[in-house]
UniProtKB/Swiss-Prot annotation:
The lineage of its organism: Archaea, Thermoproteota, Thermoprotei, Sulfolobales, Sulfolobaceae. It comes from Saccharolobus solfataricus (strain ATCC 35092 / DSM 1617 / JCM 11322 / P2) (Sulfolobus solfataricus). Belongs to the UPF0282 family. InterPro entries: Metallo-B-lactamas, RibonucZ/Hydroxyglut_hydro, UPF0173_UPF0282_UlaG_hydrolase, UPF0282_hydrls. This is UPF0282 protein SSO3251. One of its GO terms (molecular function) is hydrolase activity. Gene3D superfamilies: Ribonuclease Z/Hydroxyacylglutathione hydrolase-like (3.60.15.10). Transmembrane segments: none annotated. It holds the Pfam family Lactamase_B_2.
Length: 308
């Protein structure tokens, strides 16, 4: 099995787009890229826009050769109805979707999911509602969790986690569980016993606003619990990498992982690259170059459509 992070916060954008390849098939999970519409009361910097444009092209190129596309939920850093990523990437693919009708919040149920489904209409070879189901492809198994809360607050909606297994290993993509603040977030991982897990981490940059101290502590404790589950590698990237102090936030997790011989890494480091932290450094970027960014129309429409 080969795991290739395509776009993540440590690679410069909001995303969890990941390519997973087994000898039977190639799976692309959550093919979308986005930026924070506002951060530190500043719009995206030109460096962020340029990086998004670059990674969008990579994502489209990767999508040409995949067999399966997974959409874990309907936030714009996980799916795209055509703003930046053309919906032609779904042509002739098997598409596994989060249920657009059940265990879903209103903004996704009545606006985002229907719009997305209209945008890909008649393009995929097959569309499957994936929640809680398992699919076999020769020696590869793709399993999905039932819908679980998008972090501690169900108002943000629900996501599905995905496990991909071949004869040798299992990878779990947690989607947006915000570092697993609830015990229900751990159930799928304990059932599947993965060798590799890709997890988003807590919303620590919103501590005191959208995240309570108790929820952050629960997330760290549960990520420590995950590491004790027989893992070889943990890729922690996405929400927590929006925090300029992410390394300090994750220090307890790194300490336990080190004792257990588990590799904990960002997506960039997994690719043997230096993390490219842009959103969390937006103030610094504007100090270096305060010219307004030239934002393409599609990206402008995406940013105007709302955060997340």
């Amino acid at each position: 099995m080969k795991i290739t992070p395509i776009a993540f916060e440590s690679l410069g954008v909001r995303s969890q787009a990941t390519l997973i390849e087994t000898k039977d098939l190639r799976v692309l999970v959550d093919p979308a890229v986005s930026l924070a519409p506002r951060r530190y009361n500043l719009p995206p910097h030109q460096r962020e826009v340029d990086r998004l444009t670059q990674l969008a092209k990579v994502l489209v190129d990767v999508a040409k050769d995949v067999d399966v596309i997974v959409v874990s939920h309907y936030h714009y850093d996980h799916h795209d109805p055509g703003y930046v990523i053309p919906t032609d990437i779904y042509k002739n693919k098997i598409v596994f979707l989060k249920d657009p009708q059940n265990m879903i919040n209103n903004s996704q149920k009545y606006r985002r999911a229907p719009r997305f489904l209209r945008s890909i209409k008649d393009k995929p070879r097959k569309i499957e509602i994936a929640d809680g189901k398992t699919f076999e492809f020769n020696t590869t198994t793709i399993s999905f969790s039932p819908a679980v809360p998008h972090g501690a607050d169900e108002r943000l909606g629900y996501v599905i986690q995905v496990a991909i297994s071949d004869k040798d290993s299992t990878v779990i993509f947690t989607s947006d569980i915000e570092g697993a603040p609830k015990d229900v977030h751990l159930k799928f991982t304990k059932e599947k016993m993965p060798t590799v897990i890709i997890i988003d981490g807590p919303l620590s940059y919103l501590l005191g606003r959208a995240l309570k101290e108790e929820e952050l502590e629960n997330s760290i404790r549960n990520m420590e619990e995950i590491i004790k589950n027989g893992l070889e590698t943990v890729i922690i990237d996405h929400h927590v990498l929006r925090d300029i102090n992410y390394a300090q936030v994750l220090k307890p997790v790194h300490d336990i992982a080190k004792d257990l011989g588990v590799r904990v890494t960002t997506a960039a480091e997994y690719l043997n690259l230096e993390p490219l932290i842009l959103e969390a450094r937006r103030k610094e970027l504007y100090k270096e170059d305060n010219r307004p960014a030239k934002i393409p129309r599609g990206l402008a429409n995406l940013l105007n459509a709302g955060d997340g």
